[in-house]
A protein has these predicted regions:
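Bacterial N-terminal signal peptides
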Residues: 1-5
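Long beta-sheet-rich domains in secretory-pathway and surface-associated proteins
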Residues: 9-191
Length: 191
């Protein structure tokens, strides 16, 4: 998922010590209904403001341990250059609706081939994204059958199987159709 786009930084901003800057855009919302991709993509820009070619380690974290991340483990950024990367976040099916955050981190581990991890700090950017609400029910209905006369009680049985990631309600109604009425006026699903 590494997409590279490189460009120079102005020479007035170039520094001597190895460092990296990271900025990320908030990703789009995540749909979690059965069959959905359940993913969103974070677009980040890494900037190397130093005079060194740097190896930068990328990290991901969230308070939600169920989230899965896919990101490049490390990238190399030339002196005074920028690079764009993508981080994919995957959420479990029917995960609770709401707004969540994730952190994308970057740490310079090498400068010009020399290990500098002990003297560099981890930089991070936090993003927020929304897990969308979902609710759906399958309904199975039946009735005892036979001929029903005027005034006879009618018993219907209904079975509801619902899946949701947030509180929701759904309504159903029964429509009685006169005998001999055209079936084309019946509600969808009745014959």
């Amino acid at each position: 998922f590494l997409m590279m786009s490189m460009g120079p930084i102005s020479s007035a901003q170039i520094g001597i010590l190895p460092s990296v800057e990271i900025t990320c855009d908030d990703p789009g919302p995540v749909e979690v209904w059965p069959g959905a991709t359940r993913t969103t993509i974070v677009y980040c820009t890494l900037e190397n403001p130093s005079i060194h070619s740097e190896s930068v380690e990328i990290g991901t974290e969230s308070e939600e341990s169920d989230f899965q991340f896919a990101a490049p483990q490390a990238v190399t950024i030339g002196a005074g250059q920028e690079m764009d990367i993508q981080v994919m976040i995957r959420v479990p099916e029917l995960f609770a609706a709401g707004t969540y955050s994730a952190n994308i981190t970057a740490k310079v581990t090498e400068a010009n081939g020399i290990d500098v991890a002990a003297i560099t700090s981890t930089e991070e950017d936090s993003v927020s994204f929304e897990v969308m609400k979902y609710g759906s029910c399958e309904v199975m209905m039946g009735q005892g059958g036979g001929v029903i006369e005027a005034g006879d009680p009618v018993v219907f049985a209904a079975s509801f199987v619902c899946g949701a990631n947030a509180e929701f309600s759904i309504g159903y109604s029964l429509v009685m159709i006169e005998e001999g009425a055209m079936s084309s006026i019946w509600p969808s699903g009745f014959e």
